[in-house]
Amino acid sequence: MSATGEEMTQQSYIQHHLTNLTVGEGFWTWNIDSLLFSVGLGMLFLWLFYRAGKKATTGVPGKFQCFVEIIVEFVDSSVKETFHGRNPVIAPLALTIFVWIFMMNFMDMIPVDWLPSLALLAGVPYLKVVPTTDVNITFSLALGVFVLIIYYSIKVKGVSGFVKELTFQPFNHWAMIPVNLLLETVTLVAKPISLALRLFGNLYAGELIFILIALMYGSNVALSALGVGLQLGWLIFHILVITLQAFIFMMLTIVYLSMAHEDH
């Protein structure tokens, strides 16, 4: 596949699949494909779960309703086991994070050439379909969690309590305030950074492996046959990866917010 319709080199093929559709320049560059797919999948999640909730009955539930109930019960039990405060927002937030990130990750299951090829026919030169392979998306999600951590830390502990937590832990002595502040600030800032980079790194690496396997199809018969086996094996393994990454992001969010609700 090529934006010019000519044969691509392996390097240009990889680069093409890793390039976003953008508008703007410099700091104000917008990755349109990441925004469209992330917002679109978020709206699809809301519509599907709203529909399941609206059609819920006391009788025998349908297959989709059973599936939704299993997910909701799984997330709810995870919140009850991990979150030690009282906040009705946490369970819906955890459900949204888990399902939304899973749906964005699941886009990696679509063969790498399908949607970009269709976009090329429509005159769109680049199209990245997996939003979580865009570090801007993963950092946006992590930043949202970070804002909630700060908000609930101040709401539960008060401004003075939050400042005291930063300055008198882990060493409870006024002389250690600079050291405590440095350690606690690094720990606090590391939370969203680790959330974002873990999700981005795993999904970006997974997408790159799919692209490398796809290159084998154009080599020769032997490599093409090997590519089929490798793609099937990686596809099965990657289902575990995308689910696990959504679960880890959700669980760490619950843990961080539970820590924010702890009043020392």
UniProtKB/Swiss-Prot annotation:
Name of encoding gene: atpB
TM segment ranges: 30-50, 90-110, 111-131, 134-154, 177-197, 208-228, 235-255
Pfam families: ATP-synt_A
Keywords: ATP synthesis, Cell inner membrane, Cell membrane, CF(0), Hydrogen ion transport, Ion transport, Membrane, Transmembrane, Transmembrane helix, Transport
Molecular function terms, GO-annotated: proton-transporting ATP synthase activity, rotational mechanism
InterPro entries assigned to the protein according to its UniProt record, in alphabetical order: ATP_syn_F0_a_bact/chloroplast (IPR045082), ATP_synth_F0_asu (IPR000568), ATP_synth_F0_asu_AS (IPR023011), F0_ATP_A_sf (IPR035908)
Top-rank taxon, per record: Bacteria
Cystine connections: none
Subunit structure comment from the entry: F-type ATPases have 2 components, CF(1) - the catalytic core - and CF(0) - the membrane proton channel. CF(1) has five subunits: alpha(3), beta(3), gamma(1), delta(1), epsilon(1). CF(0) has three main subunits: a(1), b(2) and c(9-12). The alpha and beta chains form an alternating ring which encloses part of the gamma chain. CF(1) is attached to CF(0) by a central stalk formed by the gamma and epsilon chains, while a peripheral stalk is formed by the delta and b chains.
Similarity comment: family membership: Belongs to the ATPase A chain family.
Location(s), subcellular: Cell inner membrane
Chief site of localization: membrane
Protein's UniProt keywords contain Transmembrane helix: yes
Matches recorded under PROSITE patterns: ATPASE_A
Function: Key component of the proton channel; it plays a direct role in the translocation of protons across the membrane.
Claim: Cell cycle is one of the keywords in the record: no
Any one of the GO BP annotations: proton motive force-driven plasma membrane ATP synthesis
Membrane topology: Multi-pass membrane protein
Name under which the protein is recorded: ATP synthase subunit a
UniProt GO cellular component terms: plasma membrane; proton-transporting ATP synthase complex
